[in-house]
Amino acid sequence: MADKTYTPPKVWTWDKASGGRFANINRPIAGPTHDKELPVGKHPLQLYSLGTPNGVKVTVMLEELLAAGHSGAEYDAWLINIGEGDQFGSGYVDLNPNSKIPVMFDTTTKTRVFESGSILLYLAEKFGAFLPTDHNKRTETLNWLFWQMGSAPYLGGGFGHFYAYAPEKFEYPINRFAMEVKRQLDVLDRNLAEREFMAGDEYTIADMAIWPWYGALVKGLVYEAGEFLQVHEYTNVIRWTDQLAARTPIQRGRMVNRTFGDPASQLRERHDASDFEIRTQDKLEPEGSS
């Protein structure tokens, strides 16, 4: 346990320096910090995002739609560098007053869509894809979509932050959130013991929402906590994770707006399908180039 106990003051005050590596992206007020318009590309859908799990949900969905023949899902994906404060620019805040990624603008209907789950639902309804029309099956899909939206903050903002990113390690929050994440993995594992996909026998937006968080966790793609959490115990989650990881749209979706890892896996901005072949970082910045 910690050597000292924190006693909260009567009135909380913001100490920016205590934010660790995320000090520049978090603040206790909303609104823009500077004037900056967003770029607009040639495609119907404009996505402003970063290749975190919440961003990956949307790029996977867009790539799945394109692979299924929905040409209206063509999109420009613009990189939002949250470490540099891009999300606090006036143009971004106009689209997403919450200043989080991702946000999408549908130029065909002049519709802004923020929150990753809302974007998935918007696209599913717009294109009539990856969301069952049967009322019961649709409801089951939304059950799991909303489960993910409510549960993932315990994984990312809770466990991931205190285990991997916090400037100091504290036993209590790590234990508290590790317990909750293992409970969530057990929920998923029991569900997937009885069905192929999250909502049944159909691949849906529920799978696209959950995979970038929990699939990435059991594959060791986030937090490097596989041994700590003993993720090998969740065999049904691993089966489902591997099955989805083999899908080309998921492989492509994971590359978009990615700024870390293997340069060949980083497509920092996507404006055309050919970008996957010619504009990854290994092509733009070959090893050894000045």
Where are these regions (language model features)?
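Short capping/connector residues at structural and topological boundaries
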Residues: 118, 135, 202-203, 255
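Long hydrophobic alpha-helical segments typical of transmembrane helices together
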Residues: 236-290
